[in-house]
Swiss-Prot record:
Residues 514-537 have a biased composition (Basic residues). InterPro entries: DEAD/DEAH_box_helicase_dom, Helicase_ATP-bd, Helicase_C-like, P-loop_NTPase, RNA-helicase_DEAD-box_CS, RNA_helicase_DEAD_Q_motif, SPB4-like_CTE. This is ATP-dependent RNA helicase DDX55. Its main location: nucleus. A motif (Q motif) lies at residues 9-37. Residues 254-402 form the Helicase C-terminal domain.
Amino acid sequence: MEHVTEGSWESLPVPLHPQVLGALRELGFPYMTPVQSATIPLFMRNKDVAAEAVTGSGKTLAFVIPILEILLRREEKLKKSQVGAIIITPTRELAIQIDEVLSHFTKHFPEFSQILWIGGRNPGEDVERFKQQGGNIIVATPGRLEDMFRRKAEGLDLASCVRSLDVLVLDEADRLLDMGFEASINTILEFLPKQRRTGLFSATQTQEVENLVRAGLRNPVRVSVKEKGVAASSAQKTPSRLENYYMVCKADEKFNQLVHFLRNHKQEKHLVFFSTCACVEYYGKALEVLVKGVKIMCIHGKMKYKRNKIFMEFRKLQSGILVCTDVMARGIDIPEVNWVLQYDPPSNASAFVHRCGRTARIGHGGSALVFLLPMEESYINFLAINQKCPLQEMKPQRNTADLLPKLKSMALADRAVFEKGMKAFVSYVQAYAKHECNLIFRLKDLDFASLARGFALLRMPKMPELRGKQFPDFVPVDVNTDTIPFKDKIREKQRQKLLEQQRREKTENEGRRKFIKNKAWSKQKAKKEKKKKMNEKRKREEGSDIEDEDMEELLNDTRLLKKLKKGKITEEEFEKGLLTTGKRTIKTVDLGISDLEDDC
């Protein structure tokens, strides 16, 4: 192994503790890397440091060693519950890795306790562990650390415990912000004492990182470490011992090329990057069947509890394949990774550099290969200019085995594979539409038929992006995909139960629709009923003359009674009035009868 060195550890202006030097020898690091030689002396002189360095340059030791040295030089030794240092990192995997590196040193210093706080674990157990064992050095993800500061019910007062804090480290600061942890970090900073040393480490310096530097660091010393032998104006952002390749092939050829490559490199260790969690699930399952004799594991951001175990297991492997999303792209140090294969280019250019940086770490050699569609070829020049990352062409292999029919037969035999393929295709198209380099990765230029063949789809899914499009080059299978069963008998039983329920609901709904239809058919009858009622009403109105006369008589009688009560008329006049009203009514009726008799 060849190291990019900046002198031995003994050459530091501030001497290191003998046991720290012993731990470094055990780890096999006799020399410093440039970022270590630049930042460690500053940290140990109580300076705040904002360091930018290429991925794989040894940033972890650049803050682990100063933390130990600063805590060892404390006048008052830390009590069990006092926190002397906090390391915040964006992902669980990176936190586990840092905790592991730290443990190589703390085993020589039993006076220091360390604790790991990450998601995917029971927070109540974390609280109990801290109360029992303490945690002078905390390695944590932002969400879990913020949660711990807010917990009061379990008897943990972390705000009091951090009053003794000497060092805060924000590792992969740019990704902390990219992942939306700014609010959590600001909350955490409010709990921490102002008199502390702060280190901010990042692979890139953005405006957001600059804002965090201003908010969290006091008069920081800025360190920017470039690769040796490269002019500052054209400093490449990937390790100098990394060999970067690209391969241009059609969407329906890409999977065959990937499998061919992996079958010919079985004795090596690979990371295979996909753009979405659904793609990892689908292609990971396919690779398990098609690439025999090698350990294949899958990891992505939606795995809550398995991720930690899978990550630790893969790190220990001598050879194997880890199918993953960008959850593995930053800061993760997996020993002896030979190839980083980017089946899908990442959603932004900086992520390309971080993916490549999972190999060729700390002086090791390594290679990276990105698969590109013909319409994406201009991405090569873009990376060379924008990311200072030149790539060499690797030609596609001729006469590779066509494995897509095998993948189709897997989907026909197991509904789980069929559904995973459909979800993977949909998620890929949606991710493609959101690509930051949308002048190169244009959804409208995508050959959906070729892409669907590359996913070995049995039919095209229904999705907004495909609405109104025709695909004469894609031939769906002549099978009703609703009849494809799950191999898992329990899942298939549940599916059949659900289908039966849906059939019943459909029948009921059809009955309701039929009733509505019948109602429309009887409109004529309803119309007749309405007409009949209107005629009856009219007849009542036309035949109400006698009723009106009776009403008039009643009103006259009422008026006469009121006049009598008020003394306006006498009783004789009242009786005379009543008689007059009655005679008028009788006369009217009699006249009617006489007329009728005369007519007869």
